[in-house]
């Protein structure tokens, strides 16, 4: 009764007002799964390809070709297949595409179908998505990385790092973690306003004030944590997303906002120093995606005490992750479903990380929708951490609200990851 009888792809708009792909999958028993595909602003060179139309329509960002692939070739290939066989369905679509990066049909087309198939099958099974994907062991609520201050590609200010995040590691429950984050977010807003800074929010709901450098941003966050009544480090830690590929030029890290240029060793030492001066427990993309020597230097220097997350470095790709593990670089992978383009490959990346004692952080993209699938996947994989934006914008809050519901559903079985995510 789980045979796929219909697939409907459509073009909808994401949180930035750009087109994206949404897919409905209908099963023989009438069960329906719907998934919408996110889109990134700072994308790694090794990501699966998001198919865009080009031309004047939507200023070149239309996804009509990807939708056509969903309604045409993909439906013809997997229509009639049993939706329970997720691996076979995903492999069929990957083989149909026939390219190493899903550039013919589009990762946005393949992923939309892949996630919708899983959601339809969960509905047919009478199970929530996290339970269907993760089985009986899915019970860990992730620590949120809450993006409250922005720079880099996410802002028009002098700060070169892309994201400054808070992690409520000392909260007793996910619901409390969300409350703590909200209280700090609003305290920060008041502090910025009092200091004469702009408090408009960016793509991911964080503030983008005109601060001079990373230290100024970190000092504002520390003050806000304390003023909200929490202890920096013990109760609320800090995480960074440097997005270093964005300012890596000719083998150097060029901090245009600060007027500084650092080589790989100096970059590693700078980040390690910051982690010593502030309660920073996680640094994402501290080095450029192909600066393997820099990554090794950073890992040797800070890897025992700080979570070093590879985003552009690994692009949710199990093969690239295995290479990194063999090189001894980083100790964590950021998991973005649209970087790799199918549920099966996403789960493979998480499994590869966990087998090597690397952590995994489930993540949104800067262009999001009301789809809350990644909240379920964070619990399904027991990865213990989720990165899904600030405490503003409904496209971000949809994920937090879904996690609150999941914690409620799990009842006494629910466990908030808390301080288990802290290294050292």
Curated annotation (Swiss-Prot):
Keywords for this protein: Cytoplasm, Glycolysis, Lyase, Magnesium, Metal-binding, Secreted
Active-site residues annotated for this sequence: 204, 336
Subcellular location: Cytoplasm; Secreted; Cell surface
Top class in the EC scheme: lyase
InterPro entries: Enolase (IPR000941), Enolase-like_C_sf (IPR036849), Enolase-like_N (IPR029017), Enolase_C (IPR020810), Enolase_CS (IPR020809), Enolase_N (IPR020811)
PROSITE patterns reported in the protein's UniProt record: ENOLASE (PS00164)
Main location: cytoplasm
GO biological process, one term: glycolytic process
GO molecular function, one term: magnesium ion binding
Cofactor entry: Mg(2+)
E.C. number(s) listed in UniProt: 4.2.1.11
GTP-binding found in the keyword field: no
Catalysed reactions, as listed in the record: (2R)-2-phosphoglycerate = phosphoenolpyruvate + H2O
Cofactor note: Binds a second Mg(2+) ion via substrate during catalysis.
Listed GO CC annotations: cell surface; extracellular region; phosphopyruvate hydratase complex
Pfam family, one: Enolase_C
Pathway: Carbohydrate degradation; glycolysis; pyruvate from D-glyceraldehyde 3-phosphate: step 4/5
Positions with a binding annotation for Mg(2+): 241, 284, 311
Function noted in UniProt: Catalyzes the reversible conversion of 2-phosphoglycerate (2-PG) into phosphoenolpyruvate (PEP). It is essential for the degradation of carbohydrates via glycolysis.
Family: Belongs to the enolase family.
Protein's recorded name: Enolase
Organism of provenance: Chelativorans sp. (strain BNC1)
